[in-house]
């Protein structure tokens, strides 16, 4: 029926049905255009949405369809090739995804040849995305707000994630204001990481690359905003280290008035319950290997037999230099100073509870597998490879996040604009574009930023730091994007 109608208006006559009278002659295009104020696109919609009532005259319906088709395709103005392109383009727009529909509309494509050239160039619509709202999909223009992301190396050590499950600050000393403010902004990590930590490879399956003693840990820096957005979110913050000073204060007797102190509560995946570690805000200088890792230690009540009688009260004892190797508990001693009391385990106790130590930085772990995962942060070893693109990761959880870029899975949805994200940290950063929150402030000029990566980049202006060095010349840069642009000059010079 549609084919017959298409041929009928091109010949200037309508289709006849058996036994019916011949229809009247078609009105001229000028008469049709004068009777209809609608544009061709409106006639196109009316033509496709036309419905004939049951009791209406089919001949009149046929005339109406022919008229609408004539007003849409305009055979008096267009050639047969142009009309064919219009029909093919219409079916293309119906059957193709919404992204390609936007691409055609944005570029004003009018012919199949132009559309083929557009598709060969692999062009894609910019600043548009498909969002779901109330069960329906809509095209939405994206905002210009950029989102920050930390590099994949921030989760090289699973204890960096598990130790910061919950963080709170109870009281704050005047000299501890800086450290306490940092503790208040520690991010909460989803329980997914605790479940994934059991999947790390055992040490027997880990192959060490290079000499660990000759390597040093790489500094954890925020990635530039123009880096890949779909790897891993920044989830770590400086962990509490034990002061290595002979005048360190340990323990506090019950019944005495507590002094102001900063209390940090860390939940570790290695232990079934949380432990509270009270530390001094100002740490003294010392080798990193001597700084003991307090995570995973459970506080236990001191036993009468475990308290050394040889050390007088009021005299502080350096941690790790106990003369009695069998001493398993903490001696309650005091030292004068402004800092509050801090609980310190003995060196022997740390070695028993955390028997596996890193040869590079001295950090200790309860399980050998955890040490093997941590060592990858020094060696740069990446055991988990994506089977689609070949990209490698240090941990399985990083690979799982990356695979969402291939599958298109976006489980986290903004409840304001319904935009979806692959990771919860991305959603948290995105919500700041709605609230206008700028939680990161520069200490030098008091300028505030929405994302921490922006603050890190801004602080390099004050410090003059240029951590990104070119491997082919002595120049260094403060931003990775600037380094990439500089490296292009070397490649262009080599190609010429």
UniProtKB/Swiss-Prot annotation:
Write one Gene Ontology MF term.
zinc ion binding
Which Gene Ontology CC terms are recorded? Answer: nucleus
SMART domains hit by this protein = SCAN, ZnF_C2H2
Q: Which is a GO BP term held by this UniProt record? A: regulation of transcription by RNA polymerase II
In terms of one coarse class, where is the protein primarily found? nucleus
Matching CDD domains: SCAN (cd07936)
What is the protein's name according to its record?
A: Zinc finger and SCAN domain-containing protein 5C
Which taxonomic lineage does the organism of this UniProt entry have? Eukaryota, Metazoa, Chordata, Craniata, Vertebrata
């Amino acid at each position: 029926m549609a084919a017959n109608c298409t041929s009928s208006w091109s010949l200037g006559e309508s289709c006849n049905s058996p036994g019916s009278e011949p229809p009247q002659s078609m009105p001229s295009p000028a008469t049709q255009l004068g009777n209809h104020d609608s544009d061709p696109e409106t006639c196109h919609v009316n033509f496709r949405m036309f419905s004939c009532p049951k009791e209406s005259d089919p001949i009149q319906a046929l005339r109406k369809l022919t008229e609408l088709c004539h007003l849409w395709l305009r055979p008096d103005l267009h050639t047969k090739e142009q009309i064919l392109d219009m029909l093919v383009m219409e079916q293309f727009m119906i059957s193709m995804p919404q992204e390609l529909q936007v691409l055609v509309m944005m570029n004003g494509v009018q012919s199949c040849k132009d559309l083929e050239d557009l598709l060969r160039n692999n062009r894609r619509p910019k600043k548009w995305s498909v969002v779901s709202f109330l069960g329906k999909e809509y095209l939405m223009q994206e905002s210009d707000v950029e989102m920050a992301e930390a590099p994949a190396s921030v989760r090289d050590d699973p204890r960096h994630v598990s130790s910061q499950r919950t963080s709170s600050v109870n009281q704050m000393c005047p000299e501890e204001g800086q450290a306490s403010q940092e503790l208040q902004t520690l991010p909460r990590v989803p329980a997914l990481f605790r479940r994934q930590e059991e999947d790390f490879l055992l040490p027997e399956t880990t192959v060490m690359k290079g000499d660990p003693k000759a390597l040093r840990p790489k500094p954890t820096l925020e990635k530039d905003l123009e880096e890949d957005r779909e790897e891993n979110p920044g989830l770590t913050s400086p962990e509490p280290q034990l002061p290595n000073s002979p005048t360190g204060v340990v323990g506090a007797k019950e019944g005495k008035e507590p002094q102001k102190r900063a209390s940090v509560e860390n939940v570790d995946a290695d232990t079934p319950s949380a432990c509270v570690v009270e530390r001094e805000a100002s740490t003294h200088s010392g080798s990193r290997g001597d700084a003991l890792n307090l995570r995973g230690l459970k506080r236990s009540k001191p036993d009468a037999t475990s308290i050394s009688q040889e050390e007088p009260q009021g005299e502080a004892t350096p941690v790790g230099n106990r003369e009695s190797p069998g001493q398993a508990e903490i001696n309650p001693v005091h030292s004068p100073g402004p800092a509050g009391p801090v609980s310190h385990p003995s060196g022997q106790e740390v070695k028993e509870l955390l028997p596996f130590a890193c040869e590079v930085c001295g950090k200790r772990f309860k399980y050998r597998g955890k040490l093997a995962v941590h060592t990858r942060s020094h060696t740069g070893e990446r055991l988990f490879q994506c089977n689609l693109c070949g990209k490698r990761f240090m941990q399985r959880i990083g690979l799982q996040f990356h695979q969402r870029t291939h599958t298109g899975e976006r489980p986290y949805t903004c409840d304001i604009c319904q935009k979806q994200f692959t990771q919860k940290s991305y959603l948290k950063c995105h919500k700041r574009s709605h609230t206008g929150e700028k939680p990161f402030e520069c200490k030098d000029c008091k300028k505030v930023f929405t994302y921490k990566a922006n603050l890190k980049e801004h602080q390099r202006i004050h410090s003059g730091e240029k951590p990104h060095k070119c491997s082919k010349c002595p120049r260094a840069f403060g931003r990775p994007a600037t380094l990439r642009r500089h490296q292009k000059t070397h490649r262009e010079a080599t190609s010429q």
